[in-house]
A protein has these predicted regions:
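N-terminal Rossmann NAD(P)-binding subdomain characteristic of aldehyde/semialdehyde dehydrogenases
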Residues: 1-50, 87, 92
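Structural signal for hydrophobic packing residues in well-ordered secondary-structure cores
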Residues: 3-10, 82, 86, 110, ...
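Glycine-rich phosphate-binding loop at the start of an alpha helix
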Residues: 30, 47-50, 69-72, 76, ...
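Generic beta-strand/beta-sheet core signal
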Residues: 39, 66-68, 95-97, 117-120, ...
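PLP-dependent aminotransferase-like
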Residues: 49-103
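Active-site phosphate-binding strand-loop segment of PLP-dependent enzymes
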Residues: 89-123
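ALDH superfamily catalytic-core signature
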Residues: 114, 122-176
Length: 176
């Protein structure tokens, strides 16, 4: 039976590019995941939100956008823009509120098939525990290192690191 199934595989064939797997092929068949919960951060409230919402909608999913409670206005403006699109009713849902109340309800709802989240490692662990381990896509707790080579001008390095760490009040994963 499995051999027969191989004859009916549909999708796009892509050659593997991972070292050690050259020449291997993968079959990619894009399919909607269902309902995608997008939990977005406060430090990049518009760009990260758009990067989570747009692909989910484009792939045919229903989206629930739960922005950071500290910075919901950018997401609300994006929600207004999305409301102008010709989407089916219920395809996009904007749900602001505190993570400890609204977020926990959404994360634990069995109708959510996938959760995409950008935030702290602690919040990510909490979401993973509450979600029942549905499909998770997370970018958590980034701390960009500063690699300093022996021949670097230390005065220039110190200035660049200080400047980077103070941008956005240091609240970005690529601060240094």
């Amino acid at each position: 039976r499995a051999a027969e199934e191989a004859r009916t595989l549909q999708g796009e064939y892509r050659e593997g590019t991972t070292r050690g797997h050259e020449g291997w092929e993968a079959i990619v068949k894009p399919e909607p995941m269902g309902t995608v919960l997008c939990i977005t951060p406060y430090n990049y409230p518009l760009s990260t939100t758009a990067l989570e919402v747009a692909p989910a909608l484009a792939a045919g999913n229903s989206v629930i956008l739960k922005p950071a409670s500290k910075t919901p206005v950018s997401a609300a403006i994006l929600a207004d823009v999305v409301s102008e699109l010709d989407l089916p009713d219920g395809a996009f849902n904007f749900v602001p509120g505190r993570g400890s109340t609204i977020g926990d309800l959404l994360v634990g709802d069995g109708r959510v098939n996938t959760i995409t989240m950008t935030g702290s490692s602690g919040a990510g662990k909490h979401v993973a525990r509450k979600s029942g381990m549905v499909n998770l896509h997370m970018e958590l707790g980034g701390n960009a290192p500063a690699v300093v080579f022996p021949d670097a001008d230390l005065s220039e390095v110190a200035g660049a690191c200080t400047k980077g760490s103070l941008k956005y009040a240091g609240q970005r994963c690529s601060a240094v």
